[in-house]
Each structure stands twice: as C-alpha cells, then as structure tokens.
Amino acid sequence: MALFEHVFMLRQDLSSTDLESAIENHEKTINDLEGSIAYKESWGLKNLSYPIKNNKKAFFEYMNIEIPNERIQEMNSKLNLNENIIRYLSIKVRKFEETPSPMVKEKD
C-alpha cells in the first residue's frame, strides 16, 4: 500500500448535507478501491486566489490515505467525473505527519 496526502476542493455553493454526502461518497470510493483513510481534516470554506470553474471560494478537505499504487489513477478518474469536486491533489509520501496540518492550527 502506498501512502498519500490527499487534498480536494468542493464547490462553494454546496449545502451542508450535499457537502457531507460528497465527502462520504469520496470516502466510499477510496474504500471500494481497497484503500483506507488514516486521518482526515476539514479546512472549511476558503477564498481562492483565482476563480476555478466559476468558484471564488471552495471547501477544502485533507486526508491521509493508504491505497495501492495501481488504484490511485482509478481514484483520480472518479474524481474527474464528480462535478462537486473542482480540484484535487494527491502526493505520495514515505510516512504520514504526526502533527495536525498548519491549516488546522490556523483555524484555532
């Protein structure tokens, strides 16, 4: 299993129930692809530096995921088909950080 830090951005106009549903669907996708979520954070609604798909803000979600290397491309393909997710980034890491991300510290 490969380790990834995974961030994805969701549309600003989602209701709280739609937002939760979109996150749960993405978590289910990861689990269906033989992956698991080791840690997750919700960074909340943030301003974007520039509009992305007509969104000036986005909800940011961060996850540490374990998923087989050969399945990460399949996950990315499913993310591309999801109209609620406007951008994502998955970075392969050797080990997960032990401390919360700076974005969570910023909220406090």
Segment roles from a protein language model:
Residues 2-108:
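Structured, basic alpha/beta domains of bacterial-type, RNA-associated proteins
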